[in-house]
């Protein structure tokens, strides 16, 4: 009954936090032998973490940098790098999202910021409007893979792994996804007879590189300090905010004090929504733990088959399905504790497992029917969800191929953390 409450509320389009919270509250109140005071205590304790402070600060840093005009600088640099290739602006969209990912770990922020600029340009270059939107939607999902990644932070806290190691684990898959998307953009360009209208110029590249340096320095400050042992990810996030304010006020001079209340409000809302979802998902996850659901899932799956390859495929299928239906933060908090016993039985490294989980869930961002970036894309690109769904499936297939590579070639995710000593 308590699970049915969440399912019914989701079917009626209720916010995911309300669905999870109502289900957990019903269990605490009427089903389980649990003191009701445990519910608010669980909500508070689940987000009362110094590490979790990194999330609102990274969101704020990304919003500040976007308001400072660095998005246009990164797009200009991307044009100078790959604009001369066939299907150039498709490649530019991918590269720009990869750059933007280093200052904002949010796919939604990347989709809105890059998409609003690139979709009209892609149309002018000869891409169909729905195709242009699909490229921007799919490439925006590189954001949560490349550090600093908000989903990786949530997974690290939930599974008890190193945030620094998880950041590194997502970097190589993010680059691979970018390259795969660029190959598909080349195919689309040849199919639609889109020719390169720009020529590569080292002088222009150098000029745009210098112009973009203020944005490119930010990930160096964040990641250099973390891996150099100078500060924690949370401290890195606060330094990123300070740097973004300095850049916006004194370097680009596009950030005005009158903009600050709206930026702070938007960042607070985005952070609060995520934290509320995490808190409610934790309350529900603890019920699942009390009922020994994680052990039951592991036992049932291993009883179904002992073949590791089949189990990993089933795991990917489950995560992809969940990613299509649920908020990423809620999915991580709810399902990671349930799946950890199975991961341990399969002998998976927790960093590798974390990359598997987050990448499958990220693919759900642009997978019909309810991928969150699909709806951001329809708003930014001014297309219907039906038009976007028709062109998005090849991108979903590319994402699934990446998930399988990450699953069955652990070195893709573990090579960089191992090299850095994690």
Feature map (PLM): residue ranges:
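Alpha-helical transmembrane segments of multi-pass membrane transport proteins
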Residues: 1-422
């Amino acid at each position: 009954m308590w699970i049915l409450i969440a399912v019914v509320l989701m079917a009626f389009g209720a916010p995911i936090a309300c669905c999870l919270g109502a289900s957990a509250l019903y269990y605490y109140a009427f089903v389980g032998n649990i003191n009701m005071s445990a519910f608010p205590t669980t909500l508070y304790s689940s987000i009362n973490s110094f590490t979790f402070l990194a999330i609102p600060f990274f969101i704020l840093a990304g919003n500040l940098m976007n308001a400072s005009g660095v998005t246009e600088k990164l797009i200009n640099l991307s044009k100078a790098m790959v604009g001369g290739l066939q299907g150039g602006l498709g490649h530019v969209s991918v590269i720009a999202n990869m750059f933007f990912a280093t200052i904002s770990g949010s796919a939604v922020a990347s989709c809105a910021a890059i998409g609003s600029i690139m979709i009209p340009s892609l149309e002018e270059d000869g891409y169909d409007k729905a195709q242009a939107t699909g490229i921007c939607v799919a490439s925006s999902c590189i954001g949560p893979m490349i550090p600093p990644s908000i989903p990786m932070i949530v997974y690290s806290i939930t599974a008890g792994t190193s945030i620094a190691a998880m950041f590194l684990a997502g970097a190589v898959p993010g680059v691979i996804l970018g390259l795969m998307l660029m190959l598909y953009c080349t195919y689309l360009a040849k199919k639609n007879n889109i020719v390169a209208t720009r020529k590569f110029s080292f002088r222009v590249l150098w000029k745009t590189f210098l112009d973009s340096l203020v944005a490119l320095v930010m990930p160096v400050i964040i990641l250099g300090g973390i891996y150099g042992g100078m500060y924690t990810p949370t401290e890195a996030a606060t330094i990123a905010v300070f740097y973004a304010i300095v850049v916006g006020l004194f370097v680009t001079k596009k950030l005005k004090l009158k903009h600050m209340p709206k930026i702070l409000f938007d960042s607070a809302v985005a952070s609060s929504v995520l934290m509320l979802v995490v808190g409610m998902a934790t309350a529900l996850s603890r019920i699942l733990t009390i009922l020994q659901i994680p052990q039951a899932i592991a036992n049932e799956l291993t009883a179904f088959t002992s073949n590791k390859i089949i189990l990993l495929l089933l795991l990917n299928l489950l995560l992809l399905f969940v990613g299509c239906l649920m908020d990423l933060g809620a999915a991580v908090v709810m399902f990671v504790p349930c799946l950890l016993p199975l991961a341990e039985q399969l002998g998976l490294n927790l960093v590798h497992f974390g990359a598997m989980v987050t990448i499958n869930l990220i693919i759900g961002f642009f997978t019909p029917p309810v991928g969150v970036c699909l709806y951001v894309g329809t708003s930014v690109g001014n297309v219907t969800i039906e038009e976007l769904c028709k062109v998005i499936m090849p991108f979903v297939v590319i994402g699934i191929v990446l998930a399988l590579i990450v699953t069955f070639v652990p070195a893709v995710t573990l090579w960089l953390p191992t090299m850095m000593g994690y």
